[in-house]
Amino acid sequence: MRAPFRLAPALLAALPALVPAALVPATLVPTAAAHAAPAPLAPARPVHEYLALALSPDGKTLASIEGDPTPSGAVTIRSIVLRPTAGGPAQTVALPCGAVPECTPSSLTWSPDGKSLAFVLRSPGTHNHAILATDAMASPPHQLLSFNGTLVDLRYLPNGKLAVLATPDANKEVGAVQAGAAQVGVLGTDVHEQRIAVLDNGGLTFASPPNLFVYEYAALPDGGFVGTAAPGDGDNNWWVAKLMRFEPPGNATVLYAPTSPSQQIGDPQVSPDGKTVAFIAGIMSDFGPMGGDAFRLDLASGQVTNLTEGAHSTVRALSFSCAGTSLILTELAQQNAVIADLPLAGGQPATLYSTDQRLGAGWAGPAYVRACGAGITATVHQSFSSPPEIAVGLVGKWHDLTTINHGITFPVEAKSLTWTSDQYAVQGWLLLPHTATPPRPNLLQRYLPRFFPPPHPHLIPMITMVHGGPAWANMPAFIGPGLTRKFLDAGYAVLLPNPRGSYGQGEAFTRANIQDFGYGDLRDILHGVDAAEHAAPIDDKRLGLTGWSYGGYMTMWAVTQTNRFAAAVAGAGISNWQSYYGENGISAWMIPYFGASVYQNPAVYAKSSPITFITHVHTPTLEVVGERDIECPAPQTLEFWHALTDLGIPTQGVIYPGEGHGMHKPEHIEDFENRSLAWFQRWFANRT
């Protein structure tokens, strides 16, 4: 809804164009600086990123994986750093492959006695990995295993041995967001299963069978394991995975099978006494960003209990308390990150800490790591305007251990907005650039506003950025290098909505988009735009829409349903659910949301397909995608681009060579960001 003062002709006439449209033809992608309206407030030094944490058992040493991002925001060179938690100089572990891209350490894990820190290291330019170990003094690491394939989720077992998830002869990195292997030869025959393996005498002994892909695992005190697993293609079949028990040398039994196609399971944890397994279950659109309710399984009886049924929050990670009598939950409750203690004996969870900051290293996982014997925890905290730092201490009473980013700020006003859409109270974030500060009234305007009206604020453009998933959420993260930063530096406001289908308001809210893609969630987003216009001086004539993955789909969909946006940028979108079903490498994720395959019920797929309504598009739209994206394959972008080209709608399509669903090459990320900004600037320029 537009506020009345926005119609003032004098005000509209005074708004300068950001850039003449002729300067940004569709075939030219200048740097963002060439067109930014205000001067960007770039930090004096890079924003250091902390990607993983591991505390030694005695709590005296914190290991981390960290690095500085490129100008595009990608952290391509990563280091392992050790710091005494009591303070003191940090030590960097010298990696044998050096400080080069793809020399990627991961899976930090301390031995039970704290004398060894083991980790996985990828060999640059290959899918081969190795296990190495150092000590608390960051001594030169020694190799424990060289492996022809991928290794993930390394961890020490209570007996001092190492376990890992291993994929022999892997033809790609683990995960559907990684670039897919070339689709050549006989289809469906090149299947590589990821298995639980134990390092013993310089080699791996497999503890899970060769016909199952194991996604996550946890050790049992008797030497066995529990984990989530499914047969066949690991990228595709996580959505039908079951909770299983594994006994060496490879026996598997089912402990829990999801009760419906719209229930996925993740984050299995074993209690200290080995009698109970806890896990997260709920509808999840992606492996990695877990979310749902907390469940408990009694191993003796097989009884399964939902411990958080009906909660208005989403459990994103869980672990047993050090005493084993409760679960420690990492939750998202609308705009707040919450750490809660949930008694296993029953009762309501007790909130240990709640904040509107983001907690934890990386983009998904627990809010903190801990050393039970020492009673100390460590976390990474950040907000939209405050950069990440590592903090240590008791939960909620942390103090900064690092100061690398101290002094770096970003002048943005972040507002958590809540608006009504149908029966839902939808939450989102509105980010206002430093140029949005309203003019200060003089004394006469302040004390006699009836006779001397205060100055009107300048209207500012706004980009709505729709998150992927859809089972995910926009959460606070420091605005360092990246697309959001470019928009704000250009003087644009940014709206980050969390429509129905998102995490943060309980399982019923996350399930509210089942068989309704593009309808209720789009209403939520459009009502969010209205709410932003009531909360800030947003220019309704210069609204943009963008998103990646499901956000890319919503962008393609929205321009077939409304002409409200002046321009749109669809990243890795989906234009036709019917053709998409047979093109992507993860089609199992669609059954939970559509209720049946496209071959059984094509109509439910057609009603949510942008291509069904493609002749309604009038919005200039840029489409981009990675060449080897198996989650949202390039033909979906090509189909949308082809349709708009035939219909005479201004459009541009870009396919980035060799990239998967998540782009990695800094030059591609930089091109995408600059291209996106230039697209909005071009189409905003003649809308003032």
Residue ranges of model-derived segments:
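Short loop/turn segments that connect beta-strands within beta-propeller blades
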Residues: 84-88, 135-139, 199-203, 247-251, ...
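Blade-loop segments of beta-propeller domains
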Residues: 89-119
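A flexible loop/linker signature enriched in serine peptidases of the S9 family
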Residues: 66-79, 96-104, 120-132, 146-152, ...
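Serine-hydrolase catalytic core recognition
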Residues: 365-688
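Residue-level detector of Asp-centered blade-edge/turn motifs that repeat once per structural unit
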Residues: 57-58, 112-113, 157-159, 220-222, ...
